[in-house]
A protein has these predicted regions:
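A nucleotide-sugar donor-handling region in carbohydrate enzymes
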Residues: 126-193
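Active-site and donor-binding regions of nucleotide-sugar-utilizing enzymes
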Residues: 5-21, 35-140
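C-terminal amphipathic helix plus adjacent low-complexity
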Residues: 305-333
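Catalytic binding pocket for nucleotide-activated donors in carbohydrate/polymer assembly enzymes
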Residues: 261-307
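Donor nucleotide-activated moiety binding/catalytic core segment of transferases
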Residues: 71-76, 217-255
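Short internal beta-strands
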Residues: 29-35, 126-128, 211-215
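A donor-sugar binding/catalytic signature common to diverse glycosyltransferases
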Residues: 85-96, 106-108, 241-278
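Catalytic donor nucleotide-activated moiety binding site of glycosyltransferases and closely related
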Residues: 36, 45-58, 180, 202-232
Length: 333
């Protein structure tokens, strides 16, 4: 079969890389990618060839909508013939697949930001067990038979079989550090009047070595004047960052969940008022600390200790997901 993967954001690369590695043994793989954040460098890191289509359009809702329409048009013109599509969120893959009358598979763990057309046009939906799928059935008319659940988190998929790089610390100028990744202030799910707390975090952690991973070029300015802050000049392995850092502090959820599954203390200073179900579960288990108060965060980090790694369970989750994917592909062979 010809399987088309569309990759539009950095976490998508990590999630799809092991799946592509498995499926390419028996299938032809087509990959399209959007130029955003570290998406393209990571595809190169994993050795995945891609067709470049589109770029990020910033915070403007109008530009996002027009950009989506233009990219869908470009995909219709540029994507070779395929038998089934795989996408995260499905905003781009479902219209193209529907137009070409091909099935689509949508992966997501986001149960607070719903993409109407993805659920109306999608064929199969693959969710983690901790997902409010009843709402999808009620609000969008998705059938229960279209929904496939795996008993884990999406981060389990690419942490399966992970082995720490023994030379990773050669990339850094210090032996012990915490990591800070800013909020994604340009994302739709972040309130427009949100201000970053990263400068405040830098102040309270002024005596701690910090690996700073800015999302956008302009965020580098936050670190000016601090000798304890290091910004890498190349893309680092996110998994190794999460493993070796003393604590992971992030303005979103993915890095926090990755770190938590590796046993690393994690802090989310996500600015939204509503959290994903997967993040609520992480908080309930004590794996992720959620706060936007710099002093509270400082006290948590000061006393934080490593937890047990979940890697053995992650391997089981990955195998479970592969069975789900193979069962879907068998329908269309």
């Amino acid at each position: 079969m010809n399987i088309w993967f569309d990759i539009t954001n950095t976490p998508h690369v990590h999630f799809f890389a092991p799946i592509i590695g498995h499926l390419k043994q028996e299938h032809e793989i087509i990959v399209t990618a959007r130029d955003f954040s570290e998406t393209l460098p990571l595809l190169k890191f994993y050795g995945i060839d891609y067709i470049l289509t589109g770029s990020h359009k910033g915070k403007s809702r109008f530009k996002k909508i027009t950009g989506l329409a233009v990219r869908i048009r470009d995909l219709l013109n540029r994507v070779p013939e395929f038998d089934i599509s795989f996408g995260i969120g499905g905003q781009n893959t479902t219209p193209v697949s529907a137009w070409r009358r091909k099935p689509s598979v949508i992966f997501t763990d986001n149960d607070i930001s719903y993409k109407w057309h993805s659920y109306k046009l999608g064929s199969h939906f693959v969710f983690p067990f901790y997902f409010d799928y009843e709402r999808v059935i009620k609000n969008f008319g998705v059938k229960r038979s279209q929904i496939h659940l795996y008993n884990g988190f999406k981060e389990d998929i690419y942490l399966a079989n992970y082995t720490p790089d023994p030379n990773f610390m050669d990339n850094l100028p210090f032996k012990e550090f915490i990591t800070i990744r800013p909020e994604n202030l340009k994302a739709n799910y972040v309130p427009e009047d949100t201000e970053t707390i990263v400068p405040e975090l830098f102040k309270v952690f002024k005596d701690v070595n910090i690996l700073f991973l800015p999302r956008y070029e302009e965020e580098r300015a936050y670190a000016e004047g601090y000798k304890n802050i290091f910004i890498p000049d190349k893309v680092l392995s996110g998994k190794d960052v999460c493993y070796y850092t003393k604590v992971m502090l992030t303005g979103a959820g993915t890095f926090a969940r990755e770190a938590a599954l590796l046993g690393t203390p994690a802090v989310s200073f996500f600015p939204g008022k509503t959290f994903l179900t997967v993040d609520k579960i992480m908080q309930e288990r004590g794996w992720v600390f959620i706060s936007r108060n710099p002093e509270e965060i400082f006290q948590y980090v000061k006393n934080a200790k490593r937890n047990d790694s979940q890697l053995e369970r992650s391997n089981q989750v990955f195998q479970e997901l592969l069975k789900i994917i193979n069962s879907i592909l068998d329908i269309y062979k």
